[in-house]
Amino acid sequence: MSKTIQLLTCLLLLALPIAAQQKSGTLKLKPYTFENSKGEKVDSEFGALSVPEKRGDPNSNLIELAFVRFKSTSKNPGPPIVYLAGGPGGSGIGTATGSRFPLFMALREIGDVIAFDQRGTGYSKPNLGCYEQLKMPLDVAPSRAVAVEELRKNARGCIEYWRDIQRVDLTGYNTNESADDLEDLRKALGAKQISLWSISYGTHLALTTMRRHPQSIHRAILAGTEGPDHTYKLPSNVQKHLEDLAALIKADPEIGKDIPDFLGLMKSVFDRLDAQPQTVEVMDPRTKQNVKVIVNKFVLQYIVANNIGTTVTANFPALFYRASKGDFTNPAQVWLNISRQELGSAMSYMMDCASGQTAVRREQIAREAKETLLEDISNFPFPEICEEWKAPDLGDQFRSPVIANVPVLFISGTLDARTPISNAEEYRKGFPNSTHIIIEGAVHSDPLFLSSPKIKDGMLEFLKGQPVTVTKIAAPPMKFAPLEKK
């Protein structure tokens, strides 16, 4: 056994599947003082629900799903509201400690609010963390093939630990099983129905739950929609985001005169790196020693794709402006950090690989990649990494349109390249009782909930069964980083 595996065994003994003799459906609740990241405390309950790891296996392990329940402040509370984090791999409990804590508290006027840790995440057991640290070779020009091989090598270590040593059935970690977890949670809570409050991958899970258990869902909020066939991103959506961003940059009074054609600037920098990669010396934060890092087109494409549609987008003009002047220090430092980060979550890889893509979408991505600036880098390291994880594909029926009478509130941002407005509009067709809030200028994640108090107002109206009075909301304009001319 390698030293890495020995160490993981010691650190993660508490993350094992629940003993087989414990009964499926067992719910444990205890009083819990919840504390957020600011030190604010609120009385709550900590819950743990035992469910099968793989429902189709009569000899399945039991696993434990963790959640925190914030009791309703209403005298006549409605169905519980279950928060579904994104990722996949995000923690609902962890999310509640952060910037969305006031929103968790506000929704209590509707019903109990449950911060839920999906199977394999957060406080749920096992938490399928992969602690293998990447070691991308620095003396070789970075490429998709080189990076995938390093990721696959580390994936093998994580798979060996969880599957072979801890006897976890990784094939049980898919969105269908997670949807059935929510049905089991509803039953354990004694609720006739639950409402779902979701974002990003959480909407992928919410849609699957509404397909599998439509009668169990009272209402659903989907922010940043990722439909059943949206796991793989379309290059055309990413390109449209860059075009929208370029228009904002051109109109910006601070930087527009220096960057009148952002797409042209991006292309010129990519072409330069394609023809002549740059070697940059930066300090390794771990060793405090200077190392040489190769920055080429792949590196810069990946950095952009990894951050596109987030608040980091505001740094893109300065990044490319400096690069056009020959300064590649920032991308070199970022790539060094990426090349030494931990692998991530086995749950995340298994979920995305199982959800997969239809042949139609795969062909569309391949076709569009040839005509767009970032090509198909937004999906890296998928689908190649799935060859290592070997997650059973959920099939095209899973990826087909969802049709249900559940009332749904979609929330989208015009600058969200990860889960664009078109995703929500595509799936709204299956929900005749739906509303769509569009936030002008909002990127992915927090801004979909927090960029305006009107968003919370709309959510509360929707959960009360009232018409949503404002469906067009303006977020604060993006503040671009200064160009730092020399």
Regions found by a protein language model. Give the residues of each.
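Bacterial N-terminal signal peptides that target proteins for export
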Residues: 1-8
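Bacterial N-terminal signal peptides
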Residues: 8-15
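Sec/Tat signal peptide C-region and signal peptidase I cleavage site
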Residues: 16-20
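Gly/Pro-rich cap/lid or specificity-loop segments adjacent to the active site
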Residues: 21-294, 350-425, 429-486
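A general alpha-helix detector
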Residues: 244-248, 299-304, 315-318
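Structural motif
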Residues: 284-302, 309-311, 339-346
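Short helix-capping/linker segments at secondary-structure and domain boundaries
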Residues: 306-321, 358-363, 394
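Long, low-complexity segments enriched in small/aliphatic residues
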Residues: 321, 325-363
